[in-house]
Swiss-Prot record:
It is found in: Virion tegument; Host nucleus. It comes from Human cytomegalovirus (strain Merlin). Pfam families: US22 (PF02393). The keyword Ubl conjugation applies. Belongs to the herpesviridae US22 family. Its main location: virion. This is Tegument protein UL26. The gene is UL26. Keywords: Activator, Host nucleus, Host-virus interaction, Ubl conjugation, Virion, Virion tegument.
Length: 222
């Protein structure tokens, strides 16, 4: 089971208060609120339970106004499975990533919304498709995202990306402190990333299977 967060059942946390608020807003039912009781070391939602109960729903985010998290699997996003495998190679994910849906204004099409995933440390990352693709830290945890919305730094990082001021997320682009420890970046470019939309050259549709087989480039390979 993939669990990213944990406190004891008897503890009352802000996350459980947030779950109660979502229940009253019709987002989750009484059984859904119980998912905050099964926890792993960091305190928060059980990701498997969350995905099972919320899949296919738009969850309103407190900030910014009008933004939602649409809970879905990678198959309902613009990314291919191969794209996600290369996303996992970025240092910021620590080698582990679970796609949880898309984030953006509720009236946007799926391919115009950022793809959201949970990394090994529990943080929520957004994959942004642009002229040069990049990944941004959207929240320190999934419970924080649901309770407070996107980090204010998220929009600052998106602006930095537009200005060409991010570093690349591969190991050669890492910064280290005086002790040699990696300085974690809140946003980074995806090395050699290219914009990919599903297209039909001639009469042949480019499929996920073709990307996985390596016959044509994915969003993360030239």
């Amino acid at each position: 089971m993939y669990a990213v967060f944990g406190l004891t059942r008897s503890e009352v946390t802000p996350h459980e208060a947030a779950a109660a608020r979502y229940k009253h807003r019709g987002v989750i039912d009484r059984r859904g609120a119980a998912m905050t009781s099964r926890r792993a070391p960091d305190g928060g939602l059980n990701l498997d339970d969350f995905m099972r109960r919320q899949r296919g729903r738009h969850l309103d985010l407190p900030y910014p106004r009008g933004y939602t998290l649409f809970v879905c699997d990678v198959e309902e996003t613009i990314l291919t499975p191969r794209d996600v495998e290369y996303w996992k190679l970025l240092v910021v994910t620590q080698g582990q990533l679970r796609v949880i849906g898309t984030i953006g204004l509720a009236n946007l099409f799926s391919w115009d919304r950022s793809v959201a995933g949970v990394a090994a440390d529990g943080s929520v990352l957004c994959y942004e498709i642009s002229r040069e693709n990049f990944v941004v830290r959207a929240a320190d945890s999934l419970p924080q995202l649901l309770e407070r919305g996107l980090l204010h730094s998220y929009f600052e990082d998106v602006e930095r990306a537009a200005q060409g001021r991010l570093r690349h997320g591969n190991r050669s682009g890492l910064r280290r402190d005086a002790d040699g420890q990696v300085i974690r970046e809140s946003a980074c470019y995806v090395s050699r990333a290219l914009l990919r939309h599903r297209v039909t050259p001639g009469k042949q549709e480019i499929t996920d299977a073709m990307f996985e087989a390596g016959n044509v480039p994915s969003a993360l390979l030239p």
